[in-house]
Regions:
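A hydrophobic/aromatic-rich effector-binding and dimerization subdomain
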Residues: 2-23, 78, 82-147
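Conserved short histidine dyad/triad with adjacent acidic residue
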Residues: 24-40
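Short, conserved beta-strand element in jelly-roll/cupin
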Residues: 39-56, 72
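Regular secondary-structure segments
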Residues: 50, 122, 139-150, 194, ...
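Short acidic-glycine-tyrosine-enriched beta hairpin
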Residues: 60-75
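Short, Lys/Arg-enriched, Trp-marked, Pro/Gly-tolerant hinge/linker segments that flank
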Residues: 124-135, 149-203, 207-214, 227-239
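Terminal helix-turn-helix DNA-binding modules in bacterial transcription factors
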Residues: 191-199, 204-217, 223-272, 288-291
């Protein structure tokens, strides 16, 4: 199960209408995942913290967040969600395709803001706390969308689109930055690496293969990964596999051996040992505790 498969699972559980690309998911750390590993996708994401405390990382910058905080994830931005000091955090995950707001015939709303925002030519703040300027206006747009999604009356999709335009108006009129401080080249390399892991973690992966995917030597790749991720590639891959295994233990009836093989471990003893070292319990105990 990779990140995309997990999101699809959540969507099915939440009975999302696939015909309208605006998905609202209620999530919990660590109930759904002990962490959401660093990843990216083409949709925009809003992480709306409901209660608790945690960390959200956006393009390598980590933010400590708590109840009522709003985090904006632009299409293509690297992001992850983690626990803070073993505390739980409940949050709303809103994922939507910005393309549904783009006109077929270009106008100034798309050429002056939406497309430059999507391409990274301009930026907006990633995090809005209750004391941030314009927080109330931004949260009001999201709250209004949440409220109408409870009943979904005829035309609710038009209402949501209207609120999204209002949301982007606030960002464009009051929160935009013309210069993009992101180190795009470094981020693009890491996006390739993370997508490679997400696609291939269930198979044997060598450092040579991943280094080749970004045209690095093995030594340069290992140094680059450690500098940007704060851990070695081998340790990161092991933790990623264990995170996916923990979710499968909860949502599937597969045997522990099958799960170990599905997430890339070719030896059950090694899997059990690594899992207990990371989570403090065996896979069987973990499944019982979370059932």
């Amino acid at each position: 199960m990779n990140i995309l498969e997990y999101e699809n699972y959540q969507e099915k559980k939440s009975h999302v209408d696939a015909s309208f690309p605006y998905n609202t998911l209620l999530c919990s750390i660590p109930l759904d995942f002990d962490k959401v590993p660093l990843h990216w996708h083409d949709e925009m994401e809003i992480i709306y913290i409901k209660k608790g405390h945690g960390y959200v990382t956006v393009d390598f910058k980590q933010y400590k967040v708590s109840g009522s905080t709003i985090v904006l994830i632009l299409p293509g931005q690297l992001h992850s969600i983690e626990q803070y000091d073993n505390l739980s955090m409940e949050y709303e995950n809103i994922i939507f395709n910005v393309n549904m707001l783009l006109p077929r015939t270009e106008d100034t709303s798309s050429t002056d803001f939406l497309r430059p925002l999507l391409s990274g030519q301009i930026t907006v703040p990633s995090v809005f706390s209750v004391v941030s300027p314009h927080y109330e206006a931004i949260s009001a747009c999201i709250d209004a969308c949440d409220e109408i999604c409870k009943t979904k009356p005829v035309g609710y999709d038009l209402y949501i689109k209207g609120k999204l335009f209002e949301f982007f108006y606030i960002l464009s009129n009051r929160c935009r930055n013309e210069k993009n401080p992101r180190t795009t080249k470094s981020l693009d390399k890491m996006k390739v690496i993370l997508k490679y892991i997400e696609t291939n973690y269930m198979h044997r992966i060598t450092i040579a293969e991943v280094a080749s995917s970004v045209e690095f030597s093995e030594s340069h790749f290992m140094r680059y990964f450690k500098e940007n991720m704060g851990t070695s590639f081998v340790d990161y891959l092991r933790e990623y596999r264990l995170t996916m295994a923990s979710r499968l233990l909860v949502v599937s009836d597969s045997t522990i051996l099958s799960i170990a093989e599905e997430v890339g471990f070719d030896n059950l003893s090694n899997f059990n040992r690594a899992f207990k070292k990371h989570y403090g319990v065996t896979p069987s105990q973990y499944r019982k505790l979370t059932s």
